[in-house]
């Protein structure tokens, strides 16, 4: 059972990495980062089946950090959209004061 969970976790993490490396939309970038965090959560839960509840504690901590990261990231994306009119990161290469 743990092998299947780790395989699924690795596939989800790889999909997230490919999404982060290939996409330029900020919202898609955050979704891929959340997918990678959920893949790590899945592996923590799979390992906690063998070693007690330590993995579940880490999952709760990672979910808390992910929620804060998502809220802050979306606030930044909204501010970028209001200022530049787009969320495409390739258009934001020039930083002006």
Swiss-Prot record:
What is the protein's membrane topology class?
Multi-pass membrane protein
| NCBIfam families linked | PRK05715.1-2, PRK05715.1-3
UniProt xrefs under PANTHER family: NADH-UBIQUINONE OXIDOREDUCTASE CHAIN 4L, NADH-UBIQUINONE OXIDOREDUCTASE SUBUNIT ND4L
Organism encoding this protein = Gemmatimonas aurantiaca (strain DSM 14586 / JCM 11422 / NBRC 100505 / T-27)
The major lineage groups are:
Bacteria, Pseudomonadati, Gemmatimonadota, Gemmatimonadia, Gemmatimonadales
**One Pfam family recorded for the sequence:** Oxidored_q2
Task: Please report the name of this protein according to its UniProt entry.
Answer: NADH-quinone oxidoreductase subunit K
The alphabetical list of record keywords is: Cell inner membrane, Cell membrane, Membrane, NAD, Quinone, Translocase, Transmembrane, Transmembrane helix, Transport, Ubiquinone
**What chemistry does it catalyse, as a reaction equation?**
a quinone + NADH + 5 H(+)(in) = a quinol + NAD(+) + 4 H(+)(out)
